[in-house]
């Protein structure tokens, strides 16, 4: 399960980087070949556990880690959906989400003013705000889109070392905090049924689905305001 979620994260981030003309492999090599951090580039605020992909989240721990408890039927059902279909649905939903909220995302990433020493703290606090009122599919799409935007912003600002770290943070958060909800709500196969075949774009004229996206956008607006506060610190 953990490996599957990691695969989804890497595919989505690779896709977002490729849209800007970047290659995933060139940035993962940066982290793998990095044996020692230059003096002064790491902040005490970013703990070793965060760097190694085992962050200590401030959200309350879920009673079912990785969705392994009491969800065997959901896990079995998920295997019916090809991983490629989940990846494609995530890509399409992410594109549609960013199309609708392009300005908000641009404001958010530019206002965070991330550095290698503060990136993890900003990442964590934005997600705490994003999922403060609970989890839904729209917010999960926003989660992926935020991670992609953060990776692109990192590369644009010549902080390539953050790309693989962001992927690890996302996979860890997905496993520990989102996977239980995903399995309780039909697994990724349900996501594909709802958002596959470019359904997010096709549903733009449908009021019910539009309202779901709109509520996600309202949540994102709160994240943008939070980002503005971070920029002053």
UniProtKB/Swiss-Prot annotation:
SMART domains: BCL, BH4. Keywords: Apoptosis, Cytoplasm, Cytoplasmic vesicle, Cytoskeleton, Endocytosis, Membrane, Mitochondrion, Nucleus, Phosphoprotein, Synapse, Transmembrane, Transmembrane helix, Ubl conjugation. The chain crosses the membrane at residues 210-226. Disulfide bonds: none annotated. Gene3D superfamilies: Blc2-like (1.10.437.10). Residues 29-71 are annotated as: Disordered. It holds the Pfam family BH4. A motif (BH2) lies at residues 180-195. Proteolytically cleaved by caspases during apoptosis. The cleaved protein, lacking the BH4 motif, has pro-apoptotic activity. Phosphorylated on Ser-62 by CDK1. This phosphorylation is partial in normal mitotic cells, but complete in G2-arrested cells upon DNA-damage, thus promoting subsequent apoptosis probably by triggering caspases-mediated proteolysis. Phosphorylated by PLK3, leading to regulate the G2 checkpoint and progression to cytokinesis during mitosis. Phosphorylation at Ser-49 appears during the S phase and G2, disappears rapidly in early mitosis during prometaphase, metaphase and early anaphase, and re-appears during telophase and cytokinesis. Potent inhibitor of cell death. Inhibits activation of caspases. Appears to regulate cell death by blocking the voltage-dependent anion channel (VDAC) by binding to it and preventing the release of the caspase activator, CYC1, from the mitochondrial membrane. Also acts as a regulator of G2 checkpoint and progression to cytokinesis during mitosis. Regulates presynaptic plasticity, including neurotransmitter release and recovery, number of axonal mitochondria as well as size and number of synaptic vesicle clusters. This is Bcl-2-like protein 1. It comes from Sus scrofa (Pig). The lineage of its organism: Eukaryota, Metazoa, Chordata, Craniata, Vertebrata.
């Amino acid at each position: 399960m953990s490996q599957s979620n990691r695969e989804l994260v890497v595919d989505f981030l690779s896709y977002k980087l490729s849209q800007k003309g970047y290659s995933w492999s060139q940035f993962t090599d940066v982290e793998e070949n990095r044996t020692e951090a230059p003096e002064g580039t790491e902040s005490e605020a970013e703990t070793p556990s965060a760097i190694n992909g085992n962050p200590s989240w401030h959200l309350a721990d879920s009673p079912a880690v990785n969705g392994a408890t009491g969800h065997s039927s959901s896990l079995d059902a998920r295997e019916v959906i090809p991983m490629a279909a989940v990846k494609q649905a995530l890509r399409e939903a992410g594109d549609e989400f960013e199309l609708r909220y392009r300005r908000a995302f641009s404001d958010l990433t530019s206002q965070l003013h991330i550095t290698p020493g503060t990136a993890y703290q900003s990442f964590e606090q934005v997600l705490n705000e994003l999922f403060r009122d609970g989890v839904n599919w729209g917010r999960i799409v926003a989660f992926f889109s935020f991670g992609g935007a953060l990776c692109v912003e990192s590369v644009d600002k010549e902080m390539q070392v953050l790309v693989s770290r962001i992927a690890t943070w996302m996979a860890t958060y997905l496993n520990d905090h989102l996977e239980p909800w995903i399995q309780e709500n039909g697994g990724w196969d349900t996501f594909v049924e709802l958002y596959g075949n470019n359904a997010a774009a096709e549903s733009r004229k449908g009021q019910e689905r539009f309202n779901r996206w709109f509520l996600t956008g309202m949540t994102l607006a709160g994240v943008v305001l939070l980002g503005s506060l971070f920029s002053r610190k």
